[in-house]
Amino acid sequence: MFSNYKKKKKIYFSKMHGLGNDFMVIESIKQDFILTKSIIENLSNRNTGVGFDQLLLIEKSNNFKFDFHYRIFNANGNEVEQCGNGARCVGLFLFLKGLINKRKIMLSTNKKNISIKFMSDNNIQVNMNEPSFKLEEISISKKIVLNNFSVKLINKNLKCSLVSIGNPHCVIKVESINNAPVKKIGELLEKNSIFPQGINVGFMKVINKNHIQLRVYERDVGETQSCGSGACAAVAVGIAKNLLCDNVKVDLLGGNLIIKWKGFNYPLYMIGTACHIYDGYIYI
């Protein structure tokens, strides 16, 4: 039994969270290992592994314009395009590990590149780029008009809006955040054939033009305490529909974020905290 450990690779990691959205953060800059889908699934198990919503992998960048390359894997081992809360945690990880010594970090990703800035109030700002309402940015099986999209679920049409924040989001406006059918509708939309690669589903209640409440059902994960890209998506839709101003507080189950967007042709900014929980190592 114990001899098996000699055959395994020891890797060091940090457990972190952004407003309750929790991560296992690993760097492959100073250590060498191979991650497979099954390994990630085992690591994500909250009873027998580390347990997390997503695994964040930091790699060397092949482009001199960027400090590092950043990859995101859901708990089921699937690689995804974007994670706003994760980006803030990656920034804090790089700072705590002494891998960076400047206030602004440039990260390349598999889809959209992002920049991270450390603020004077211990918050972290992420430039999430301009939201996209273009069909080609969202994997969908039929042509639709994005701001007038409805899908038939449970014998009724559900009105929602679609937007990409580097990853696909469906935003639904609700009257009650507590009574929103997050799990029921989230599962139905995620598995709907109209979204062949799945979809993140946000349920947004508008309090006023500067304040919303939000719950998010994340693709491959389920409802989480917080979703940074989901907050960006909800605010982008709200601003595009003239429901919100350009500076919005977003209340999530795990805390709040500030989202700023001046509108089309401008980048969107997310501001919030990141927390380091503990460091550890595990054999894979």
Swiss-Prot record:
E.C. numbers: 5.1.1.7
Domain of life: Bacteria
Family matches, as PROSITE patterns: DAP_EPIMERASE
InterPro entries associated with the record: DAP_epimerase_AS, DAP_epimerase_DapF
Pfam families: DAP_epimerase
Protein name: Diaminopimelate epimerase
Enzyme active site: C83, C227
Family: Belongs to the diaminopimelate epimerase family.
Residues the record marks as site: Important for dimerization: Y278
Purpose: Catalyzes the stereoinversion of LL-2,6-diaminopimelate (L,L-DAP) to meso-diaminopimelate (meso-DAP), a precursor of L-lysine and an essential component of the bacterial peptidoglycan.
Site keyed Could be important to modulate the pK values of the two catalytic cysteine residues: positions: H169, E218
One cellular-component annotation, GO: cytosol
Subcellular location, record wording: Cytoplasm
Keywords attached to this entry: Amino-acid biosynthesis, Cytoplasm, Isomerase, Lysine biosynthesis
Major localization class: cytoplasm
HAMAP family in the record: DAP_epimerase (MF_00197)
Residues engaged in binding substrate: N21, Q54, N74, G84, N85, N167, N200, E218, R219, G228, S229
GO molecular function: diaminopimelate epimerase activity
Pathway linked to the protein: Amino-acid biosynthesis; L-lysine biosynthesis via DAP pathway; DL-2,6-diaminopimelate from LL-2,6-diaminopimelate: step 1/1
Matches recorded under SUPFAM superfamilies: Diaminopimelate epimerase-like
Catalytic reactions of this protein: (2S,6S)-2,6-diaminopimelate = meso-2,6-diaminopimelate
Single GO BP term: lysine biosynthetic process via diaminopimelate
Signal sequence interval, chain numbering: none
Quaternary organization: Homodimer.
